[in-house]
């Protein structure tokens, strides 16, 4: 072991012979060979584009939602979703640094925090989507019974639970990710890598099963059940729409259309999440299986592109949300920028439209 690698590992608990002799998965560290420059430029271009789109999209979505000055539970959860996306994509610059340097040169502290923050923010995202679907279902049931929605304390407690549980569930990654020296395929010497170093196989298997079940499968089941129930209620309500005497007919249709738009948007967010997060969940399970099947090879480059695909979800979420619910606002911004005369007209009409709530509370 070179002195540099020995210093990089830093102080920590003593490692068992099994941990020392084990070949660890290098995650973002990789030896790219002769095409290193071309591959690094391609990776930087893709992740850089995702980072810019995600940053602008989520910030604009936050501003547009806050400007409506609504304080419902759905609004709080949607804002929480955008914040989680911003936190998740904040890891992109660090990932690019590792892809350029190949070896891990960011130190042990960043090694502990990088994957922890990524996992925690991903957990917050799916739990928030599950909470949104559950809140929508409960809200519809409450409205049918003439009851009010959850108060601010309940909303704050729900957000605190989502972040607190996600932080605790991902805590083993913060503890067990460490910098170790390892010789990678294609390399001629050991280099420091940031990897997950479990003390035993049982703990690794237990945590993987626990995390995938409680942070992916269970929220997914909640989402499916909630939206199925919402769909049933929506169909039944539309059949009775013309028979209701509580509101005028035009108001009933307007509310129904708004609820349907919100339902469709949140459903798209849910579908996109499962499509774009399923590959990384499967890859993590394959990395676990790789410990027992040495003939199963998972290249770090494959892991990178799977993570890049997952990063893209954070850029897609605000696009889906904005295009579905804020078309008029984006049209106004476009016209104000390119056609100032038309922008004034959109500004006047948007003031009247702001009185209508896109997100029912």
Curated annotation (Swiss-Prot):
Q: Which residues cross the membrane?
A: 46-66, 78-98, 104-124, 157-177, 205-225, 269-289, 296-316
PTM Phosphoserine: list the residues. 350, 357, 360
Provide the alphabetized UniProt keywords: Cell membrane, Cell projection, Differentiation, Disulfide bond, Endosome, G-protein coupled receptor, Glycoprotein, Inflammatory response, Lipid-binding, Lysosome, Membrane, Phosphoprotein, Receptor, Transducer, Transmembrane, Transmembrane helix
Write down which residues bear the modification named Phosphothreonine: 347, 349
The record's subcellular location field reads: Cell membrane; Endosome membrane; Lysosome membrane; Cell projection, Cilium membrane
Instruction: Please provide the Gene Ontology terms (biological process) for this protein.
Output: adenylate cyclase-activating G protein-coupled receptor signaling pathway; brown fat cell differentiation; fat cell differentiation; G protein-coupled receptor signaling pathway; ghrelin secretion; hormone secretion; inflammatory response; negative regulation of apoptotic process
- PROSITE patterns from the entry? G_PROTEIN_RECEP_F1_2
What does the record say about PTM? Answer: Phosphorylated at two clusters of Ser and Thr residues located in the intracellular C-terminus. Prerequisite for FFAR4 internalization via an ARRB2-dependent pathway.
- Give me the Extracellular side stretches, as residue ranges: 1-45, 99-103, 178-204, 290-295
**Segments on the Cytoplasmic side according to the record's topology features:** 67-77, 125-156, 226-268, 317-361
**Glycan attachment residues as annotated in the record:** 21
- Show the Pfam families listed in the entry: 7tm_1
SUPFAM superfamilies given for it? Family A G protein-coupled receptor-like
What protein name applies here? Free fatty acid receptor 4
For this protein's source organism, the top of the classification is: Eukaryota, Metazoa, Chordata, Craniata, Vertebrata
